[in-house]
UniProtKB/Swiss-Prot annotation:
Recorded GO CC terms: endoplasmic reticulum membrane; intracellular membrane-bounded organelle
Residues bound to heme: H49, H73
Single Gene Ontology MF annotation: metal ion binding
Annotated compartments: Endoplasmic reticulum membrane; Microsome membrane
Family statement: Belongs to the cytochrome b5 family.
Topology within the bilayer: Single-pass membrane protein
Protein name, as recorded: Cytochrome b5
Keywords assigned by UniProt, alphabetized: Electron transport, Endoplasmic reticulum, Heme, Iron, Membrane, Metal-binding, Microsome, Transmembrane, Transmembrane helix, Transport
Chloroplast among keywords: no
Cited function: Cytochrome b5 is a membrane-bound hemoprotein functioning as an electron carrier for several membrane-bound oxygenases.
Length: 138
């Protein structure tokens, strides 16, 4: 269902937008973002955003939930954001926003030579022995 461009109030309740529609609104003439599955038309707010227009435009047409929460917006900022809601992301599109958990993969090079495992300690032992001998001869 296509929603109206009227932002704010409770008029947005029950208005759903498909992800493809939201993704089209990614420019300075029409800037929409998704935060917690709600669609915000922030076009008129770009110039007023305390963090600058660029941070909002980077998120335009996509899910800005993580960035919104990471910044730690004030209660006033959260209340102000409510005035820009125009609808919700269609329930069928919500799984598309789920990001896979990041996995840290550590690899060990199997071609590390075994000579370095004994040569380096052997050289260190020789240096220590020479230093000890030099110290004892004084």
């Amino acid at each position: 269902m296509v929603g109206s461009s009227e932002a704010g109030g409770e008029a947005w309740r029950g208005r759903y937008y498909r992800l493809e529609e939201v993704q089209k609104h990614n420019n300075s003439q029409s800037t929409w973002i998704i935060v917690h599955h709600r669609i915000y038309d922030i076009t008129k707010f770009l110039d007023e955003h305390p963090g600058g227009e660029e941070v909002l435009r980077e998120q335009a047409g996509g899910d800005a939930t993580e960035n919104f929460e990471d910044v730690g917006h004030s209660t006033d900022a959260r209340a102000l954001s409510e005035t820009f809601i125009i609808g919700e992301l269609h329930p069928d599109d919500r799984p598309k926003l789920q990001k896979p958990a990041e996995t840290l993969i550590t690899t060990v090079q199997s071609n590390s030579s075994s000579w370095s495992n004994w040569v380096i300690p052997a050289i260190a032992a020789i240096i220590v022995a020479l230093m000890y001998r030099s110290y004892m001869s004084e």
